[in-house]
Amino acid sequence: SLKEIIEALPYQPPFLFVDALEEITENGSKGYYQLKKDEYFYQGHFPNNPITPGVILIEIMAQIGLVCYGIYLAKEKLKDQEALLVPIFTSAAVDFLGPVYPEDQLEVTSEKIYYRFNKLKCLVTCKNILTNQLICKGVFSGMIVNKDKIDQ
């Protein structure tokens, strides 16, 4: 289920950026995150004029559009090895098109480019629901690897 996918994410607050998943299919995913006005990164970026850092937007897009989607696609492997598998983010090329502020509501949509040999590549877009503005878009890649291979 979509709730189980969120529960399988290897993140915890304050670094969990998935509020809800609306849908995941073989071709893509859609999910949401609302930025809270007291997010830890607004204290320094920027005082008295908080703007969401681009690296946080990339992380939101990666968690919803790549990791949640990758967990769905790798569900057969996860049944047997859930504790042993971890997502590895390998690359992103992102265009930023507008600022994001505290309390903005983001919709992240992912479209599969390919998934093979545990590597997933997607076109991911992020839209501000409140303004209906496309905020950023990019191509993201990642893979599911066995934790034992990372520890070496």
Where do the language-model regions lie?
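Non-catalytic linker/capping segments at the edges of enzyme domains
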Residues: 1-51, 75, 84-85, 97, ...
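Hydrophobic beta-sheet segments that form the core/acyl-binding groove
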Residues: 21, 90-130
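Hydrophobic beta-strand-centered segment that forms part of the acyl-chain substrate-binding groove
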Residues: 66-109, 137-139, 143
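Residue-level signal for glycine
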Residues: 132-134
